Amino acid sequence: MAKIKSQRQLVSMTKDSSPRQPASEPHSSDSDSSDEESDHLDAVSSRKKRKLSVDFSQEEGDDEDDNQDESDDDDDVDEDGGKMKQPVAKPTFAFNAPSRIKRHPAKGDSERIGKGQPVTDAEMEDAVQSVAQAAGKKRILAPTDQNTTFESLGVEPWLVQSLANLAVKRPTGIQKGCIGEILKGRDCIGGSRTGSGKTIAFAVPILQKYAQDPSAIFAVVLTATRELALQIYEQFKAVSSPHVLKAALIIGGSDMRSQAIALAQRPSIVIATPGRLADHIRSSGEDTICGLRRVKFLVLDEADRLLSSKGPGSMLPHIDECMAVLPPPEDRQTLLFTATVTPEVRALKEMPTRPGKEPVHVCEVDTQVLAIPDSLKQSYIQLTVTHREHFLHEFLLTAANTERSIIIFVNRTSTAQFLHHLLRLLDHRVTSLHSKLRQQQRIDNLGRFRASAARILVATDVASRGLDIPEVSVVVNYDLPRDPDDYIHRVGRTARAGRKGEAVNFVGQRDVELVLAIEKRVGRPMEKWEEEGVNLETRVIRDSLKLVSEKKREALLNIEENREVGGRRKRQKLKLGAE
């Protein structure tokens, strides 16, 4: 049996962008790799127990192109419909991958890199601890008194009882730090990791102030995605009970006319995505939007995404259109909340205030040292790019994962669509969530996942922010995000509110620098994924090479023929023209 090559350097610590090819296996493209596999298969028929060896350093396909932001209406680049490789039959398969990711050393060890001496895990752990301790000295922390209650923060009894009915009995750190200050009339910038209760931190004081002085369109809440807007809408309704709250949900994918009517009726709270609200400001007329000119509260939830100027999916132009009709900052309370406090968010601390108004209150709770909770286990699986789907299938079939609720994150809508088709053909209970789906289909798919009718959700970054699904046990990064902050939002879908969770990252050759950047951002190294009695490489070789390759062809054919998941052809609307 051929031995797996040992101690293979995955990627050099220099800035060379191209992978290093071994001299003995000079193939530079997927087609060359396919030819080499065919030659080996011919040799198998004549020589017994001959093993096929695939080089881990072969080029990645177009699936690893630059990531694109998931805004409401952005288009994504289609995946490369490359020529399918022939499935490898029964011969065994050797994956040449190093057992550990080579990480950068701690400060003071630069000389050791030049000598080729790796840094031990213990040294890396010490470096991470020292960085975390240094960062902790500079943060503004909310009170941590365990005896703090909502009553002591000034919350009225009816709201305290409403929260108790929702099993919310004690305020979290971000709620302790913000609710009292918002009730005093201060603008607020709140930063706290995912799952820490940021929605309640701004919903409670808004509802209390509204009950004291009700008026039309008392507050506008802007957020990054339709699903998050719907969730905030539902949470406002739940917290405001037993009182009847007149709220309007203004998001893309829904009927503009009914939304315009709802705005014209002066709801108490407007929850919206910036793009759709900007559409109404441009086209629905003054009678519809005049209520926005007297708003008392403006909330930017996921403020880092809303204020980001990166890429073609930036929402800043829509935000500017919305701000143009709202009262000036000195005449309203402005609240910004996010899990990742960016320089753009912090810059708003200098917003002008009217004379006598207190300065902006900034509360950051565990946004640097504890960007992810301690209850989240991070791990990685190193694999060959051409067999990513095979590893995913076998990972989902392991004993520990057969009953767990799992979200699989990808970078592009085309990948999400492909995996939805493929995993359904492989008999997994799966659904998907991405920007190419109709809005009602997005709501239905998310509902199926929440209700456990589907245990796997394949999603782009539209599902990475704010969604609270307590049952999610595992987050799989099928494609690693290009921005470490996006990683924090993705893995924040699990291990919420003190629960345990797991984040598993699929790492190809070119992903190692991304892993190192993520580890630096979250302050903790990832561990190699392990499960007792499970060897994914062996399972892929033994069970999945032929099966998954066949189903992959079928999935691609279904997509090409415009079939729905499950094989039915999509209905085409016929347009009848006059002859």
Swiss-Prot record:
Any one Gene Ontology BP term: rRNA processing
Domain Helicase C-terminal: start-end pairs: 391-537
Region (Disordered), start-end ranges: 1-117
Residue ranges of the motif Q motif: 148-176
Compartment annotation: Nucleus, Nucleolus
Pfam families: DEAD (PF00270), Helicase_C (PF00271)
Polar residues biased stretches: 7-21
Record key words, sorted: ATP-binding, Helicase, Hydrolase, Nucleotide-binding, Nucleus, Ribosome biogenesis, RNA-binding, rRNA processing
Spans through the membrane: none
SMART domains: DEXDc, HELICc
Coiled-coil features, chain-numbered ranges: none
Segments of skewed composition (Acidic residues): 57-79
Enzyme Commission designation: 3.6.4.13
GO molecular function, one term: RNA binding
Matching PROSITE patterns: DEAD_ATP_HELICASE, HELICASE_ATP_BIND_1, HELICASE_CTER, Q_MOTIF
Function according to Swiss-Prot or TrEMBL: ATP-binding RNA helicase involved in 40S ribosomal subunit biogenesis and is required for the normal formation of 18S rRNAs through pre-rRNA processing at A0, A1 and A2 sites. Required for vegetative growth.
Domain commentary: The Q motif is unique to and characteristic of the DEAD box family of RNA helicases and controls ATP binding and hydrolysis.
UniProt name for this protein: ATP-dependent RNA helicase DBP8
Gene behind the chain: DBP8
